[in-house]
């Protein structure tokens, strides 16, 4: 594992975060099985509403800096190739991996065509445990043992902000603030960029993370279903977090096939909505 301080610097200032305008595309909003679920004929799995069709949860963030755009991919699960083609993802300057569960990482090798565009290594940002797991899962990539593989560099992160730089535009960079929250017995990685934050696959949101989310305008947050789950937030728990941090709008992701979009969305409080695949969020450059 290597760290390139020019590409990914961990010396950024802590405290208030000023971010550029962002375009956030939710590539997938479904739980680990995706929706429709294989073999299921429930009302949601057979729904004609495209918002009920949910690929595995991931997102693509484009930061529009003065120097140029920076493209950050959040997770690359088994649907990543399909998602990237559907939503015209043509560049990835860094991959942020929330955790090592299969629905978030098994599309990692589909970054190859984007690497080959300029052959600059793609940083893979993850918590240390996740980075270790990724190395074990994809040794042929990270050990450089296969000549046709892309060059992906693991970057274990802690609590310090990091700067992600464009792989193609000189001087274009954005600060990313890591967020750590429990997903059952281990932690997952969330992030904040300026007025935007993303936190999926969490069973609770600790006080330290809530403090780091203060002033966020747009929050993408785990919300599996109305009923309790040991490692995911319920709709009510997610709404409580959104209210506590003062988010202007909160979009729930990682949603199961037990949730019909129209009916469930109507039950949520003001400012909290069910996300859906292909949703595009424009977040203005603000100081938080």
Regions found by a protein language model. Name each.
Residues 2-199, 265-287:
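Binuclear metal-dependent hydrolase catalytic cores
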Residues 204-286:
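Cap/insert and terminal regions of metallo-dependent hydrolase folds
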């Amino acid at each position: 594992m290597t760290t390139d301080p020019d590409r990914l610097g961990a010396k950024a200032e802590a405290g208030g975060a000023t971010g550029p305008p962002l375009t956030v595309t939710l590539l997938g909003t479904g739980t680990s099985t995706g929706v429709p679920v294989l073999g299921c004929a429930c009302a949601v799995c057979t729904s004609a509403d495209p918002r009920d069709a949910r690929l595995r949860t991931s997102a693509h963030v484009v930061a529009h800096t003065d120097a140029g755009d920076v493209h950050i991919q959040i997770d690359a699960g088994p649907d990543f190739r399909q998602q990237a083609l559907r939503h015209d993802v043509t560049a990835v300057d860094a991959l942020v991996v929330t955790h090592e569960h299969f629905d978030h990482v098994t599309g990692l090798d589909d970054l190859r065509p984007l690497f080959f565009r300029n052959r600059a290594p793609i940083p893979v940002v993850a918590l240390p445990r996740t980075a270790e797991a990724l190395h074990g899962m994809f040794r042929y990539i990270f050990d450089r043992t296969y000549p046709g593989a892309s060059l992906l560099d693991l970057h274990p992160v802690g609590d310090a902000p990091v700067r992600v730089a464009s792989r193609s535009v000189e001087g274009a960079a954005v600060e990313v603030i890591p967020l750590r929250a429990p997903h059952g017995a281990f932690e997952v990685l969330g992030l904040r960029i300026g007025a935007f934050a993303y936190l999926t696959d969490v069973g609770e949101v600790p006080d330290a993370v809530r403090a780091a989310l203060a002033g966020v305008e747009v929050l993408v947050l785990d919300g599996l279903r109305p009923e309790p789950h040991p490692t995911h937030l319920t709709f009510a728990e997610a709404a409580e977090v959104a209210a506590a941090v003062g988010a202007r709008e909160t979009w729930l992701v990682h949603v199961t096939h037990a949730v019909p979009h129209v009916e469930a969305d109507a039950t949520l409080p003001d400012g909290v909505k069910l996300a859906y695949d292909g949703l595009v969020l424009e977040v203005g450059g603000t100081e938080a």
